[in-house]
C-alpha cells in the first residue's frame, strides 16, 4: 500500500554550503576551546535548505522544537574527525548548518551514526565510543569508549542514564551485538548472535523493554532489560534501520534497503504506510506534529512523513 495517510517532503543537502566552511589546520583540535555554531541570520524572503553530509540519524528536540540531524561526514580514510550536527527547523529550513562541528576546537566526532536526546544531553555513537553533548550549548560533556566494540550503529538512553547500543557487525553472527552501558560507564554485551541478524535500530517500549530491528531480516525483537527475548514481530520488509516506539506501543520501522516505512500497532500485523524513501535511516518522531522525520544517509537529505491528524 503506497503512501497511506502520509506526505513525504525531501530536503536535499547543499554541498556548496558544507564545503564553504573551511577546516582548521591539522592538530588544532585541542588548542582552542569548543565553540558552537550559530543560527543562520536570514531575511524573511530568504530560506536555506540542506547542509547534510551522510545524515544517519535525527532526534527531536521538543524544548526548542528543532530537529537535531547527526551527520557522519566524510569517510575516515578521506577526512578524519569530520562528523557534525545540524539543527533543522520543522519546515525543513536550516536553523544552524553546523551547530556541533563548525570547527574542531575541543571536538572529537569522527563518524557518528545513531543519536538520542536524554537528560539534557545529545548522545551519539561514534565508531567504538559513545559521546554526549550539552543540549543547551553543544559542548562535549563526556565519552565512553568500549573495548572490543567495532562499529556501533544506534543507541537508546533510559531515564536512569543506562545506554543500550547496537553493533551491526559483519556476516559473522558473533559480531551481532546489543551492548548495555551503565551510568558509571561499565559496558557489557547484553545480547549476541541470533535472533539478532545485523541489528540496527534500537528503542525502548513503554514497559522499559528493549526493541531492536535487523538489517538482515524483517524481525522486530523485544528483549527484557536483562537480555531475554520476549516477543518477535515482523515488519513488512527486511533491511531495517530506523525504529520509533510511541507511548501506546505502536512501532514504526524504516527499511534502509527498500525505502519503506511500516507501522505495527499492538497486537496487529505490520502495514506499509510509506515508500519511495531511499536509504531511510534512523528516524525520530515529532510528537507536536504527529510526523516521522527520516534521514537519508548518502542522499544527504531528510524526509518528513506526515501520519495524519492525532486522535
Summary of predicted features, one role per range:
Residues 24-43, 79, 83:
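Blade/loop signatures of beta-propeller domains
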Residues 83-86, 129-131, 176-179, 219-221, ...:
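A short loop-to-beta-strand structural motif that recurs across blades of beta-propeller domains
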Residues 43-49, 94-106, 139-145, 186-193, ...:
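A short beta-strand motif characteristic of beta-propeller blades
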Residues 42, 129-160:
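Asp-box/WD-like beta-propeller blade repeats and closely related beta-sheet repeat scaffolds
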Residues 2-19:
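Gram-negative bacterial Sec-dependent N-terminal signal peptides
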Residues 70-96:
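Beta-propeller domains
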Residues 88-93, 134-139, 181-186, 223-228, ...:
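Short loop/turn segments that connect beta-strands within beta-propeller blades
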Residues 52-64, 75, 103-122, 147-175, ...:
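Beta-rich, blade/repeat-based domains predominating
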Amino acid at each position: 500500500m503506497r503512501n497511506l495517510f502520509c506526505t513525504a517532503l525531501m530536503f536535499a543537502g547543499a554541498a556548496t554550503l558544507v564545503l564553504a566552511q573551511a577546516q582548521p589546520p591539522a592538530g588544532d583540535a585541542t588548542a582552542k576551546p569548543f565553540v558552537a555554531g550559530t543560527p543562520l541570520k536570514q531575511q524573511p524572503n530568504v530560506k536555506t535548505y540542506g547542509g547534510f553530509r551522510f545524515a544517519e540519524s535525527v532526534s527531536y528536540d521538543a524544548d526548542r522544537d528543532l530537529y537535531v540531524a547527526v551527520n557522519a561526514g566524510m569517510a575516515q580514510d578521506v577526512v578524519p574527525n569530520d562528523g557534525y550536527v545540524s539543527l533543522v527547523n520543522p519546515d525543513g529550513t536550516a536553523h544552524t548548518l553546523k551547530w556541533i562541528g563548525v570547527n574542531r576546537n575541543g571536538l572529537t566526532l569522527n563518524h557518528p551514526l545513531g543519536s538520542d536526546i536524554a537528560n539534557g544531553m545529545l548522545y551519539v555513537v561514534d565508531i567504538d565510543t559513545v559521546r554526549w553533548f550539552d543540549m543547551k550549548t553543544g559542548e562535549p560533556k563526556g565519552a565512553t569508549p568500549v573495548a572490543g566494540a567495532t562499529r556501533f550503529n544506534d543507541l537508546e538512553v533510559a531515564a536512569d542514564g543506562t545506554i543500550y547500543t547496537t553493533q551491526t557487525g559483519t556476516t559473522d553472527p558473533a559480531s551481532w551485538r546489543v551492548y548495555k552501558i551503565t551510568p558509571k560507564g561499565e559496558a557489557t554485551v547484553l545480547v549476541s548472535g541470533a535472533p539478532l541478524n545485523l541489528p540496527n535500530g534500537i528503542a525502548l517500549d513503554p514497559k522499559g523493554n528493549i526493541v531492536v530491528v535487523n538489517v538482515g531480516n524483517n524481525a522486530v525483537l523485544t528483549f527484557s532489560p536483562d537480555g531475554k527475548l520476549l516477543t518477535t514481530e515482523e515488519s513488512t520488509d527486511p533491511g531495517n534501520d530506523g525504529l520509533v516506539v510511541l507511548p501506546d506501543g505502536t512501532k514504526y520501522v524504516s527499511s534502509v534497503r527498500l525505502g519503506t516505512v511500516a507501522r505495527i500497532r499492538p497486537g496487529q500485523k505490520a502495514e506499509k504506510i510509506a515508500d519511495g524513501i531511499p536509504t531511510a535511516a534512523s528516524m525520530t518522531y515529532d510528537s507536536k506534529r504527529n510526523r516521522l522525520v527520516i534521514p537519508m544517509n548518502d542522499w544527504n537529505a531528510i524526509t518528513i512523513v506526515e501520519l495524519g491528524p492525532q486522535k
